[in-house]
């Protein structure tokens, strides 16, 4: 009987020792495999060109001051490029083969025929409201107009950033903005926006909530208005409802696969809303030519430098200007 018990104990001890040996062997083997795998990654990583969606590299100047003309850029064999331009450019060029000519020129910069798309727009305001930016990289040509510089900067803000917007019922509710990224965006054929700030007793500050004529006018007869008021303060809002809509919007972040080339003007547009910071030009460049052929030639010359400060694709394939949430 004692012999059987000793045999059982001995068998258990041998099993434990054998199991321990097997586990150590497996551990050593896995360590060896993982070490070799990490070493392989470390060795090949300098030679791999990948897209980093988390890195944002802003442009700090204009094309005519910063970038160097180059014909030896990356070969974008699997990427698409959309070039958006005002219809006046096509009318001025007046050449049925001009797009084919540009495609051949883009080919010299590494962009295969068929990878570059040309899309015109009639009105930059309408385009900005729903840009439909479907390509991997999207470059928007925007003509500078010194009579509407502030309007154009708002349009650039819409194009270069993604927004999450909710409908506003201004007839029933007061609204307040809670951060710098929170704005009220009004669109329509004729938008006149008036606001009345309220105190903690919901009484107007410098205005009467029952008298619209005492409200402060922040925009008058415009197609697009981005309204920025004092954060943390309730406001009574009045707009021309029949010709305008208003939405409470939050800026989600930059649309990394979009850049704007400003055609003309003394300086590149500044869309920085915070007056306490140094103005920042975010993927906005400037070309200083009068004729559209010259503009397109410049774009072809610098396209690979422009692409380097962008990220391929954005958060969604359908990168319309706004996300609506009911």
From Swiss-Prot:
Annotated function: Calcium-binding protein that interacts with rotavirus cell receptors once the initial attachment by VP4 has been achieved. Rotavirus attachment and entry into the host cell probably involves multiple sequential contacts between the outer capsid proteins VP4 and VP7, and the cell receptors. Following entry into the host cell, low intracellular or intravesicular Ca(2+) concentration probably causes the calcium-stabilized VP7 trimers to dissociate from the virion. This step is probably necessary for the membrane-disrupting entry step and the release of VP4, which is locked onto the virion by VP7.
More details: Some rotavirus strains are neuraminidase-sensitive and require sialic acid to attach to the cell surface. Some rotavirus strains are integrin-dependent. Some rotavirus strains depend on ganglioside for their entry into the host cell. Hsp70 also seems to be involved in the entry of some strains. In group A rotaviruses, VP7 defines the G serotype.
Annotated region described as GPR motif, given as residue ranges: 253-255
Gene Ontology terms for molecular function: metal ion binding
Organism: Rotavirus A (strain RVA/Human/Japan/S2/1980/G2P1B[4])
Glycan-carrying positions: 69, 146, 238
Residues bound to Ca(2+) 1: 95, 206, 214, 216
Subunit annotation: Homotrimer; disulfide-linked. 2 Ca(2+) ions bound at each subunit interface in the trimer hold the trimer together. Interacts with the intermediate capsid protein VP6. Interacts with the outer capsid protein VP5*.
Family stated for the protein in its record: Belongs to the rotavirus VP7 family.
Signal peptide: 1-50
Keywords from the UniProt entry: Calcium, Capsid protein, Disulfide bond, Glycoprotein, Host endoplasmic reticulum, Host-virus interaction, Metal-binding, Outer capsid protein, Signal, T=13 icosahedral capsid protein, Virion
Protein's UniProt keywords contain Calcium: yes
Protein name: Outer capsid glycoprotein VP7
């Amino acid at each position: 009987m004692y012999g059987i018990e000793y045999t059982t104990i001995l068998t258990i001890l041998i099993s434990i020792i054998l199991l321990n040996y097997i586990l150590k062997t497996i551990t050593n083997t896995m360590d060896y495999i993982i070490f070799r795998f990490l070493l392989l990654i470390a060795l090949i990583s300098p030679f791999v060109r990948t897209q980093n969606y988390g890195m944002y590299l802003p442009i700090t100047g204009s094309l005519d001051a910063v970038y160097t003309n180059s014909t030896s850029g990356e070969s974008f064999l699997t990427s698409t490029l959309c070039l958006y331009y005002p219809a006046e450019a096509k009318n001025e060029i007046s050449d049925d083969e001009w797009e084919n000519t540009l495609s051949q020129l883009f080919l010299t910069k590494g962009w295969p025929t068929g990878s570059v798309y040309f899309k015109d727009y009639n009105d930059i305001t309408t385009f900005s409201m729903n840009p439909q930016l479907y390509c991997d990289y999207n470059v928007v040509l925007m003509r500078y107009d010194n009579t509407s510089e502030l309007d154009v900067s708002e349009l650039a803000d819409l194009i270069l950033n993604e927004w999450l917007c909710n409908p506003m019922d201004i007839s029933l509710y007061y609204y307040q903005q809670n951060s710098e990224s929170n704005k009220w965006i009004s669109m329509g054929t004729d938008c006149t926006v008036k606001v009345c700030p309220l105190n903690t007793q919901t009484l107007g500050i410098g205005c009467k909530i029952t008298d619209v004529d005492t409200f402060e006018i922040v925009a008058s007869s415009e197609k697009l208005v981005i309204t920025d008021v004092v954060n943390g303060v309730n406001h009574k809002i009045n707009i021309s409802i029949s010709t305008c809509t208003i939405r409470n919007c939050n800026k989600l972040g930059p649309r990394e696969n979009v850049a704007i080339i400003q055609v003309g003007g003394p300086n590149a547009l500044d869309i920085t809303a915070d007056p306490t910071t140094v103005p920042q030009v975010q993927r906005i460049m400037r070309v200083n030519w009068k004729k559209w052929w010259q503009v397109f030639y410049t774009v072809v010359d610098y396209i690979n430098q422009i692409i380097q400060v962008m990220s391929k694709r954005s958060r969604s394939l359908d990168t319309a200007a706004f996300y609506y949430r009911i």
